[in-house]
């Protein structure tokens, strides 16, 4: 029922491989089927769900085995996150992380299509294959920069410490403990 | 039907709706009254709008519904706010949300949950999140339109639950300068309204390159998209196999089939389509978005702005922990998960794998659309589709109590709410959730190829 289209990075990155006669090579991936001719075909198609998100993610199933990260690992994560240890319910965080990880660890078993040619940085939603900047071009770019009111760069228009809860003589204040007694 | 409502009327009704549904975090005591001198056909002069409280405004506070930014007032307006003010829009207030946009129920706010106004006489039901207040402000007819933000469905899900239109444009179309970052590779400003003509005008007003936003779609690429536009007749619509789930809200299929019949009668062609990567989207999303959130929220130390602990900057040897303890529970959970995904033990296994699978998803979408993708250089599939139609939610809005209980059992229970919306966020596609029936929280998303926002808007207008 489905036509299939090969994604071809040799001709057009992320695009379709075109053989010049408006026909595409079939290898899997996304597929478009034949046009529905009537509502009965559509009803039939919609009456057959193909998967259950609960089953796929192993939620509410007996097979779900949770392996919580250790208490030490949780404490390390709290430190990395700038969150206090005092008052933190370590066991609760362990269990919660275990459930979150059982959910996202599904990734391990999913094969990447065309792994060799797939670049993780193409996941960014910006133009692919832009021209590379080099040191000279960077310097050239900087040399043309000037103060721009459109960017809010207006001299004297803004007091840097104006939004700080504590400041002194136009400096930000960090308390003494910040520099001492650090682990 | 008039485009603009009376500002006086909105202000009069606001207080009773606010006390019932907890829609706003702050209300503008003197809404703007600016005349648009240009008087173009896109003018929004006199329209009333609300702004989600994670978009900065210099005239009243921006809190992200968090203790961390309580009383914070930005020294500047976000670009989208500036453009609305220039267009003569009255801004009624800032709307409630899940703290920093993290949540799908609209319940994680220091101001308390937003209550769904579609159920005035029943047990309090969720509005959906995170743009919960934005959707409620539109559903209550307090505003002509609302600005929200959509990271994984945060405009579309509450729009569905409030039975209003919710549009997430292509990533990069609307400026994010002044939008407080949650997950920068996904965050998009979105528009909610009851009327497609209003939504379209707002979109055209805001759809501009902004040099202040490094991810703003360039002028060159916008011109390329315009150049790619051709009349496509008949319009080809796809129904995605992977979005066909066993559990759908009661009444969904009847309304869905009725719409499909209407499309056939209008001469549109309908095709089955399979996009296998759609199944992988929730694990991809919940690997990437908390990692980006952990990075973005590391800036809140209390030194330069926002809340600061009055006694200490360090506790247990952890910098800024006394201040950062004021984050809400859901935000803390996502920061911890994000840092786990980013730490050296897990980095290669989780983060990069998720990025590569995201590329697979984008490429699969490219494979089924007729319109080219200017970001990936896909030339478009000449036999491809123009529009996909996808359900917005697999559930009806439940009670706030049930939602909180389910979420406490496992965070995955609330993550599942995003199953129909996250794929388009990961691929940056324009997606508009429209109600299938008036005052009914059942919606359908109309999805186009990257950059093809106008086809999505035209399609919805043609069937409204």
Curated annotation (Swiss-Prot), chain A:
GO MF assignments:
ATP binding; glutaminyl-tRNA synthase (glutamine-hydrolyzing) activity
> Which organism does this record belong to?
Saccharomyces cerevisiae (strain ATCC 204508 / S288c)
Which compartments does it reside in? Mitochondrion inner membrane
**Topology class, membrane:** Peripheral membrane protein
Annotated GO biological processes are:
glutaminyl-tRNAGln biosynthesis via transamidation; mitochondrial translation
Question: What's this protein's family per the entry?
Answer: Belongs to the GatF family.
UniProt enzyme class: ligase
Q: What does this protein do?
A: Allows the formation of correctly charged Gln-tRNA(Gln) through the transamidation of misacylated Glu-tRNA(Gln) in the mitochondria. The reaction takes place in the presence of glutamine and ATP through an activated gamma-phospho-Glu-tRNA(Gln). Required for proper protein synthesis within the mitochondrion.
Entry keyword Secreted: no
Q: Which miscellaneous remark does the UniProt record hold?
A: Present with 172 molecules/cell in log phase SD medium. This protein may be expected to contain an N-terminal transit peptide but none has been predicted.
CDD domains attached to this UniProt entry: GatF (cd21422)
| UniProt main location, coarse | mitochondrion
Which superkingdom heads the taxonomic lineage of this protein's source?
Answer: Eukaryota
Q: Report the EC code(s) recorded for this entry.
A: 6.3.5.-
Q: Which UniProt keywords apply?
A: ATP-binding, Ligase, Membrane, Mitochondrion, Mitochondrion inner membrane, Nucleotide-binding, Protein biosynthesis
Protein name listed in UniProt: Glutamyl-tRNA(Gln) amidotransferase subunit F, mitochondrial
Q: Which reaction does it catalyse?
A: L-glutamyl-tRNA(Gln) + L-glutamine + ATP + H2O = L-glutaminyl-tRNA(Gln) + L-glutamate + ADP + phosphate + H(+)
Quaternary structure, per UniProt, is: Subunit of the heterotrimeric GatFAB amidotransferase (AdT) complex, composed of A (HER2), B (PET112) and F (YGR102C) subunits.
Q: A GO CC term?
A: mitochondrion
| Bridged cysteine pairs (disulfide) | none
Q: Which InterPro entries match?
A: GatF
């Amino acid at each position: 029922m489905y036509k299939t289209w090969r994604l071809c990075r040799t001709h057009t990155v992320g695009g379709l491989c075109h053989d010049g006669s408006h026909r595409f090579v079939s290898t899997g991936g996304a597929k478009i089927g034949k046009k529905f001719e009537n509502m009965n075909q559509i009803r039939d198609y919609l009456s057959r769900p193909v998967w259950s998100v609960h089953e796929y993610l192993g939620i509410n199933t007996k097979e779900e085995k949770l392996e919580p990260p250790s208490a030490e690992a949780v404490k390390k994560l709290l430190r990395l996150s700038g969150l206090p240890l005092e008052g933190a319910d370590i066991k609760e965080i362990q269990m919660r992380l275990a459930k979150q990880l059982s959910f996202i660890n599904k990734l391990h078993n999913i094969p990447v299509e065309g792994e060799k040619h797939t670049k993780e940085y193409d996941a960014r939603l910006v133009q692919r294959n832009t021209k590379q900047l080099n040191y000279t071009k960077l310097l050239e770019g900087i040399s043309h920069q000037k103060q721009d009111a459109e960017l809010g760069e207006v001299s004297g228009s803004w007091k840097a410490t104006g939004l700080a809860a504590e400041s002194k003589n136009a400096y930000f204040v960090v308390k003494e403990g910040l520099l001492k007694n650090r682990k | 039907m008039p485009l603009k409502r009376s500002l006086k009327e909105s202000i009069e009704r606001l207080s009773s709706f606010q006390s019932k549904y907890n829609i706003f975090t702050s209300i503008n005591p003197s809404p703007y009254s600016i005349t648009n001198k240009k008087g173009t056909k896109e003018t929004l002069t006199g329209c009333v709008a609300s702004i989600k409280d994670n978009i900065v405004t210099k005239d009243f506070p921006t809190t992200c519904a968090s203790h961390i930014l309580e009383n914070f007032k930005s020294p500047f307006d976000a670009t989208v706010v500036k453009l609305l003010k220039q267009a003569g829009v009255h801004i009624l207030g800032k709307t409630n949300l899940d703290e920093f946009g993290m949540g799908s129920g609209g319940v994680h706010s220091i101001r308390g949950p937003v209550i769904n106004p579609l159920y005035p006489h029943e047990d309090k039901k969720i509005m959906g999140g995170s743009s919960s207040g934005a959707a409620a402000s539109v559903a209550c007819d307090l505003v002509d339109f609302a600005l929200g933000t959509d990271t994984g469905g945060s405009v579309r899900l509450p729009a569905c639950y409030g039975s209003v239109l919710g549009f997430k444009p292509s990533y990069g179309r609307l400026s994010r300068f002044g939008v407080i970052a949650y997950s920068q590779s996904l965050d998009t400003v979105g528009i909610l309204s009851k009327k497609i003509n209003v939504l379209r005008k707002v979109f055209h007003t805001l759809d501009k390159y902004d040099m202040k936003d490094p991810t703003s779609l360039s002028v060159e690429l916008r011109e390329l998209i315009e150049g790619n536009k051709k009349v496509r007749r008949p319009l080809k619509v796809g129904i995605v196999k992977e979005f066909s789930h066993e559990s759908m809200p009661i009444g969904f299929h009847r309304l869905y089939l009725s719409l499909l019949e209407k499309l056939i009668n209008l001469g549109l062609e309908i095709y089955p389509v399979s996009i296998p990567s759609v199944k992988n989207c929730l694990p991809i999303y919940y690997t990437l978005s908390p990692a980006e959130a952990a990075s973005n929220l590391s800036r809140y130390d209390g030194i330069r702005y926002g809340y600061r602990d009055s006694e200490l900057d360090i506790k247990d040897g952890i910098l800024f922990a006394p201040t950062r303890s004021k984050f809400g529970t859901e935000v803390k959970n996502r920061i911890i998960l994000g840092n786990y995904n980013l730490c050296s033990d897990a980095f290669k296994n989780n983060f990069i794998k998720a990025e590569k699978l995201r590329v697979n998803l984008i490429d699969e979408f490219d494979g089924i659309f007729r319109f080219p993708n200017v970001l990936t250089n896909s030339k478009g599939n000449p036999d491809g589709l123009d529009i996909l139609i996808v359900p917005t939610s697999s559930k009806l809005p439940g009670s706030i109590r049930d939602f909180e209980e389910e979420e406490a059992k496992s965070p995955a229970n609330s993550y599942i709410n995003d199953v129909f919306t996250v794929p388009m966020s990961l691929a940056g596609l324009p997606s508009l959730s429209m109600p299938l029936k008036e005052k009914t929280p059942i919606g359908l998303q109309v999805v186009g190829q990257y950059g093809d926002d106008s086809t999505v808007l035209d399609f919805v207008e043609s069937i409204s």
